[in-house]
Amino acid sequence: MAPKKKLELDIRGMTCDRCPQHIERALKQVAGVETVEIPGWRSNKATLIVKSDIAERDLTASVEGAGYHATVKSSSAIDGEIEQSAQSSFTEDGGHDFDLLVIGAGSAGFAAAIKATDLGFRVGMIGYGAIGGTCVNVGCVPSKTLIRAAEAWHNAGHHPFKGANTQQGNLDWDLVRTQKDDLVSQMRQSKYVNVLAAYPKITYIEGAAQFTKDGSVRVGERIYTADRYVIATGAHPRMIDFPGSEKAEALNSTTLMELEQLPKSLIVLGGRAVALELGQTMARLGVDVLILQRSTRLVPDHEPEIGRGIKDYLEQEGIGVITGVEVKRLSRDGDTRIVHARVLGQEREFKADQILMALGREANTKGMGLEHMDVKLEQNGAIVVDKYMQSSNPTIYATGDVTNNPEFVYVAAAGGSVAAQNALADTKKPLDLSTVPGVIFTDPQIATVGLTEAQAKNEGYRVKTSTVGLEHVARAQAARDTRGFIKLVADETTNRLLGAHILAAEGGEAIQTATLAIKYGIKVDDLADTLFPYLTQVEGLKLAAIAFEKDIAMLSCCAA
């Protein structure tokens, strides 16, 4: 049997999907070439199995003749017959199973795997638990459909239109929960199971992944290796171990939405997105809700006006809100849960049927063996990554909630794509987090992007602001819901928009306009001069831009 060797060529000049075909044909015309594998035109590489006596200059010359440039990157001897496979490159000469192994099968993991496949690389993806990750299974999808169900039932008994008489009727929680579960199943199937089937070059592996001391990944009894790794294992609800927590058996966001029977009363620990969304949802479904927040205001990372405003609106619906609460311990007396706390220097007790802990999330990194890979972690267990999504180990990238990047599914997915490209294509593409819009799906909604007034001042800008109450927005007047406001933050020197902060019904539908304005450096007078359709909520952005210079109360409809 003639001796063989494996060559890896660095190819330059490929610009489209047809280029690898041209190069493969050119290389196979050289005597002694047995197999050619080019992952994709963006990979800039070709792997060959050739006879050992082949002249390497003949290979590079053949590539040059096809209009490209090639250099030999590595050469290694092979003993015996090697069968190359598009699904696995684990070979007797010490090759790897995959070019990229993605750990995690949620939105971030899928984005990384799809990008790597699009680039032409061999991809493995390890999933543990329900495919689809947090968003579709226990996060965005189930919570938002419950929010809409609760809103519909609430509005049936509380809408502001005279003469349009409606009644709430009875609430069938079993049916509400079943419809929620059906939607989760449908979206998991259509957006993950079916999508995976459409990418046959992604090898799906089920099980918990753990790095070993030799740098490989163990899943059950199997060992896998890869050139590069992307960790996208997400996060889970943070459950603080207060004294008495074991007996109190507090709920988290997942277990709350799975309850077979709604409690009569609920204490919510927390005052940010999940706490407010689920707290209001439960209240609108007939549960007596009390929100206890450690900070002195709700949503403390937002503009103070938003925290004050949403507190007032929640209280108007009968939801109790107490801020400045220091929880000391939990206890239980039969079916009653008790929160023992200090409020303004006084010891107090709060009682309810159930307690919901909505106190943030913790990264899923425990038990992964990352200590074997010298991967640096934050104190909360999150993987430290740079703007290219690369960890302290140059072969390992991470994205999504397992990092300390903003916990939004769209940030996770964007990071997955960036991580895969940088890991495999020798690029340095940063994940742009300069303009990340966020929406809290309370009613009214909280929608923000860019800098708050305080943040802008801290960064050294000469700041100017404008605020328009929803009573000046025609859409809100027609809908008879003028709760809230729109606040814009701008640089007085350049007139560029720096931040937008909305508290309004369906405010999330208006925030993307502000996002684009900030991203592309649009000035507030450009916003003011732009045509906005009348009787839309987003027209409020135009009015807020005009309000920097004029009193909009003195303008007619659509006037500028």
Say what each PLM segment does.
Residues 103-108, 112, 117-129, 141, ...:
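Flexible, glycine-rich terminal cap/loop adjacent to redox cofactors
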Residues 166-167, 202-206, 210-218, 285-387, ...:
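A Rossmann-like FAD-binding core segment of flavoenzymes
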Residues 88, 95-98, 114-121, 126-262, ...:
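Glycine-rich flavin
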Residues 1-101:
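Flexible metal-binding regulatory segments at protein termini and peripheral loops
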Residues 101-103, 209, 224-234, 268-269, ...:
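Short hydrophobic core segments
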